[in-house]
Regions:
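Transmembrane alpha-helical segments in integral membrane proteins
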Residues: 70-76, 154-180
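Functionally important transmembrane alpha-helices
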Residues: 40-41, 192, 196-197, 204-255
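Membrane-interface helix/loop boundary segments of multi-pass membrane proteins
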Residues: 165-190, 219-229
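Helix-boundary and loop/linker segments of multi-pass membrane transporters
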Residues: 16-18, 87-92, 139-149, 180-182
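Hydrophobic alpha-helical transmembrane segments
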Residues: 25-29, 58-59, 96-104, 152, ...
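Membrane-interface interhelical connector segments
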Residues: 121-147
Length: 255
């Protein structure tokens, strides 16, 4: 009798997404394109910034950051108006340690997939990593250093704003506008497939790197159904590879 009561309670609390599902899908697709703008524009601007004056570089950085903040406002407001999850859970020490565990798991998956990619294809980086690395390599060319305002903007996009927007969209909005509250497997798999497809995967191994990353991020989100957890894991993951390059740039810039 107790089991039946619990089952009925779960069914009654299994909330449906708000709005029309077809419209929600179209909005989701549009937002995929929208969230590419901040990091895309900043990476395009980076190599050209060596030719810009200091004032132009600062103005461009402010413009890119302003556009990014506007997009965050739009995407966040849409998410908050459609979510069926509690958005005000605190981040305790236990949660931080668990998220670091998810980060380590994601890094292990990435290393194993990269090793397989090297063995079977001879490539040691994915197309997405290569594109970002080529941009970041500019930061260590001491004769043609980009202005610090543009560099700080790129780092901000890669480490903070990019992960923030991607988690809002690929975990939060995708799950909570297209699936019922307690659905797991379908949003887990499909969101990870879509996430991987957005990272320029060119072979099965590079696809696996981002698919498994998407899986780990979804598990981080699903643990408490709190988007802040997957955001933290994603931001830490991007920062691990980006911040050392930024520190090297700062050392060259202020020498």
């Amino acid at each position: 009798m107790v089991i039946m009561d619990d089952l009925k309670q779960n069914q009654s609390s299994n909330e449906k997404p708000k709005g029309n599902k077809i419209i929600n899908i179209l909005i989701f697709i549009g937002m995929i394109l929208l969230i590419q703008i901040p990091i895309g524009v900043s990476l395009i601007a980076l190599p050209f910034s060596v030719k810009f004056s200091q004032l132009t570089s600062i103005a461009l950085s402010m413009l890119i950051t302003g556009i990014a903040l506007l997009i965050i406002w739009l995407v966040r407001n849409y998410y908050l108006s459609h979510t069926y999850e509690r958005q005000y859970q605190s981040m305790r020490g236990k949660d931080i340690f668990i998220n670091i565990g998810f980060l380590i798991l994601a890094m292990v998956f990435s290393i194993l997939s990269s090793l397989l990619m090297v063995i079977f294809t001879g490539n040691d980086t994915t197309a997405n990593e290569k594109e970002i690395n080529e941009s970041l390599d500019l930061l260590l060319q001491k004769d043609h250093l980009p202005h610090i305002s543009i560099v700080a903007t790129v780092v901000l996009m890669i480490c903070i704003i990019g992960p923030y927007l991607e988690e809002l969209l690929f975990r939060g909005i995708f799950k909570e506008t297209l699936f019922m509250k307690y659905r797991f497997w379908l949003p887990f798999i499909i969101s990870s497939i879509i996430f991987s497809s957005q990272h320029l995967s060119t072979n099965i191994f590079s696809y696996a790197i981002y698919f498994l990353m998407g899986c780990v991020l979804y598990l981080a989100y699903n643990r408490r159904r709190n988007i802040k957890d997957s955001m933290m894991v994603h931001m830490l993951n991007n920062s691990v590879s980006t911040l050392p390059v930024f520190v090297g740039y700062l050392w060259l810039y202020f020498r």
